[in-house]
Each structure stands twice: as C-alpha cells, then as structure tokens.
Amino acid sequence: MIEKLRNIAIIAHVDHGKTTLVDKLLQQSGTFDSRAETQERVMDSNDLEKERGITILAKNTAIKWNDYRINIVDTPGHADFGGEVERVMSMVDSVLLVVDAFDGPMPQTRFVTKKAFAYGLKPIVVINKVDRPGARPDWVVDQVFDLFVNLDATDEQLDFPIVYASALNGIAGLDHEDMAEDMTPLYQAIVDHVPAPDVDLDGPFQMQISQLDYNSYVGVIGIGRIKRGKVKPNQQVTIIDSEGKTRNAKVGKVLGHLGLERIETDLAEAGDIVAITGLGELNISDTVCDTQNVEALPALSVDEPTVSMFFCVNTSPFCGKEGKFVTSRQILDRLNKELVHNVALRVEETEDADAFRVSGRGELHLSVLIENMRREGFELAVSRPKVIFREIDGRKQEPYENVTLDVEEQHQGSVMQALGERKGDLKNMNPDGKGRVRLDYVIPSRGLIGFRSEFMTMTSGTGLLYSTFSHYDDVRPGEVGQRQNGVLISNGQGKAVAFALFGLQDRGKLFLGHGAEVYEGQIIGIHSRSNDLTVNCLTGKKLTNMRASGTDEAVVLVPPIRMTLEQALEFIDDDELVEVTPTSIRIRKRHLTENDRRRANRAPKDD
C-alpha cells in the first residue's frame, strides 16, 4: 500500500492556474464523477479566496489513479501566508511547481520554492498555459533553472522533470509541440518522480499536527501526516505540546481524504495525510503519539511577523448601527479564535482596554483577517499598518522586501523615481524586447506601505507588482512614503447634500456622493493641497419664492472615489483610522472634533 502512496504540494504564483490544474486532475482521474456537476476552483474554498483569486489556507485533496493514491496539498503563494507554507512542506515528499508559460517564475513562487529546497524536496516543473498567445516555454524553463541555481539547489534538485500543460483544456505533454489528449503525462510524472513516503509502518504511532480545522459538531480537527505506525478510531494516544507538556486523549474518528471529501476510515497507516477528531484543544506542531512510546517531533518553525496595526473598538457616532459584534470582548474573543490556526499572527493587549495590537506577515495577511471579520458582522476601527523594528546586536533594524515590477517602458522613469524616493535599491533590470521591463528592487517594508495604489495610478493599471519578505537590516534614516495631500474633513453630522458637494469639487476629490450619511471628523475627500481642510457638506440651497426653482443649472457631481479596504489602509496617515463595518468602509480622524485635533497637535509627540 505504501509504495502506491504519493504526497505532493503544489506551488504556483497567483493566477498561474494551479487551482484549475487541480480541478482537471480530479475530474480526469475519475475521482469526480464526470457526469456529476463539477464545481470550478474547488481548492479555493472560502469566499475571499474565490473573489481575490488567491489561496490563503493550505488545503488537501486526494486523487486515485491506476491504484495509486496521490495526496495533493495546495500551498498559498503569498509570503504573507508563510506560516501556512512551512507546515505544508513537512507533510510532503515533493513539490509540483506550476509556472505560467508567458510570465515565468515570480517572486512569490521563489519564496515557497526556497522553503521546499530547505526541506530537501525535489521539484517537478509544470509549464502551464502553453496555449496562450505569446507563450515562450523555452525561455521560462531557462528562467526556472536560473531561479533554482540562485536558491542554491543541489544537483539532484536541478535535474528536474518538465511537463507542459494547458490546464484549461485539460491536456499535458512532455514536449510543448506534442501534447497528449489528457493529463496522463502529468500523472505519470508524479508517480515516477515522487518518492514513496519514507516512513516506518511497524513502529509505534506518531504524527505531527500541521493544520487545524474546526467543526462545531466535533470540535477541533487535527490534520497531519502519520510519521510512523498506524492509527484507528478510539485508540488511546498521548499529546505533547511545544513546551513538552503531555496529556492523554482518545482518538474519535480518523478521516482520510478522497477528492475533496473527508471519508471515515477504520485504519490509517504511516505516510498518509489524515484528519483526527476528538483530541480536545490542539495546537499546530503538537505531536500525537502512542501512549507507550512518548517521543516529540521537532517543532515547526514559523517566520516572525513584520507588520503590526491596532484593532480598536469603533467609537464613531454610527457605532453599532451596521454590525452585530462591537464590544472589545467580542473582538478579542474573535482574535483569539483566529490565533488557533493562524500561526503567523500575534495579538497583544495594550494599556487601552479597547485597543489590541495585531501583528502579521504583511498588509495582505492582516487585511484578509479584517475582511473576514467584517463579513462575520464585526465593527472595528483599525490604524495604519506599521513595520516592526528589531534590536539586533544593539543596532535598530527594519524588514526589507524583494519587489518585482513589470511595467511598460513609458512608465519606467516615473516608477523608478518613486521607488528611489522610497529608499529602494535597484538590483536588476530586464527589458523583454516587447515594450515591457521587469525591475527587481530591495526596499524597506515601510517604503512599500501605500505604494501599491500610487503604482497603479502611475502605470494606468497596466503594471504588475509582487513583493516578498527578504530579511532584516539596518534602518535607513528619514521618513518614507508620507502622503503628499491633505484631506477634506466633515464639520458636522447628517446627510451630504449635492449642492454643498458641488461647491467642494474644486477643492479636491470626494469619497462620497449625494445622500451619504456623514459625521463630524469623517474624511470625505482628498484635498488638492497639502493641508487638511474642515468643510461643510451639509448645507442645502437656500430657496426663496422669488425665483422658479427650475431656472438654475443642474448640479453635476463627479463620481466619487470608492476605496477598498486595502486602499483605505494604504491611504491613511498616523492620525487617522479606517472604520470597518459589514456594509461600509469609512475613513476618519482619530480625534473627531476640530478642538480635539488642535489640542492633539499641540501636545508633544511621544514617538
């Protein structure tokens, strides 16, 4: 049985098609009934993942093909979710690197591939989308080889098999000129090149928990790969946590994977990836083992957080109107629940009972958490993301990121100038000969906060930007990436009126239209100059009975700017907050009245 088992992780950059590839592998292996209605993008299970087209949580699926059982674990591509990636690598024996036949390998793939090499895994490279116009598979293979060399791959890892595929059409082949009619070459490559798990079948049971799931019916579900021995329902086991404390428990159900379903099994053997219920409170990296042989496996390491922000109770005048959960206790309970499976997250209580400091791997990591909370009915206010400085050998250090930008040549100058002002160092410049340039930078993380939206405007939406955490290094002196413009602040509470907004359009760009509810201290637009301006957007037109009301010109408003959560977080300054509720995202000053703001500006800065 063990010789027929294969465990493999899939690595791919956002939008290179790994989720579609898994769909097709499932359909063609007969794991899904071909007549059954197949759901698209099966691996991206939560709404946020489907909307953004990114994978956040690592997920498992299993395929049966010609008596072989292939466990496939999907990995998140973003370094922000590096905590997930670490754990996946401890469960598999090889990685499937999916690369777009036009784009080539991207920095996010680099991050995950580096982790895979550190675990000594050998890759299989899948060049996907070979049918797309402009595909250049040979160039991509060279790029992948160069990437592997840069990551210090061993000779064995550099001798990798290549499979060409078009996941959308469900075909693969060993040569991009000569494709088979289905995915068989890819299944064959997995079976031939992935080693069977190197495990001890006869020893006492031992496994490490590398993922957690929660189900209100059975409680916490621990997922991991059995290192040695066998496990069956109702077996007595001992659990060792990361501090070495032990406790006894009884296994409830043992669930294996088939397709996307979890199916109950009576016996699971070493090498297989299973889910176990009934073990009570579990943590990532706990070891579950036989009661007679209590041996802990080495703990899984997870990268430290690099960005933090404050989650505060919503104190605006509209507090409680739109959300169900608004108190500090509810917010803290929700954050503690998130800590159970989100291992790269840290939550600290502050002196202020209504504010919590939440640290994570990056802006994306934290904004995904905020978006999830908002959908669950929470109301909260969040501050601007700040990077976490460290003291190393008496020197203050800050995080740096590798950034890859792909821009049209006409925008190259302005982008390079902007990154120069944000203290970025150009490492590599690579024109593709077709009017686009790829730029590689190393830049302090704080220089990137707020840069994405500016970059999109600069390149008229045609630029691509990817970043991954690189390392900690000495702090560069000076401020980075401060907002140039001031803001327009409402001076009262009520409904915004078109007549008043029309008069404000010359002052800057507005965030809201006619009829929107506003309150004092809410930011309603960007000022065209660098200072903040308190304005009145509530006054209607004075009507007299001297004139017919129809003779005046119609008021025409420019459509307002609608900000997403990420854009709002990038936009705000240190004295501002983003108010997040289930139905709206508003930006406000930390001090709502003008008197309070003046008083705060006079107070000495304690930074």
Swiss-Prot record:
EC numbers for this chain: 3.6.5.-
Leading EC class: hydrolase
Keywords for this protein: Chaperone, Cytoplasm, GTP-binding, Hydrolase, Nucleotide-binding, Ribosome biogenesis, RNA-binding, rRNA-binding, tRNA-binding
Residue span of region Domain III: 303-385
Disruption phenotype: Decreased extracellular K5 polysaccharide production at 37 degrees Celsius, increased extracellular K5 polysaccharide production at 20 degrees Celsius. Cold-sensitive growth (20 degrees Celsius); cells have a long lag phase and double more slowly. Decreased capsule synthesis. Cold sensitive growth and decreased capsule synthesis are suppressed by an rluC deletion.
Domain spans labelled tr-type G: 3-198
Complex formation: Monomer. Binds between the 30S and 50S ribosomal subunits, in a similar position as ribosome-bound EF-G; it contacts proteins bL12 (L7/12), uL11, uS2, 16S and 23S rRNA and the A-site tRNA. Binding to the ribosome alters its conformation.
Domain notes: Crystallizes with 2 superdomains; the first comprises domains I (residues 1-202, also called the G domain) and II (203-302, also called the beta barrel domain), while the second is composed of domains III (303-385), V (386-482) and a BipA-specific C-terminal domain (CTD, 483-607). Domains I-V are homologous to domains in EF-G and LepA; although the domains are similar, their relative arrangement is different. The structure of isolated superdomain 2 is more compact in the presence of Mg(2+) than in the intact protein.
Family: Belongs to the TRAFAC class translation factor GTPase superfamily. Classic translation factor GTPase family. BipA subfamily.
Name the record gives this protein: Large ribosomal subunit assembly factor BipA
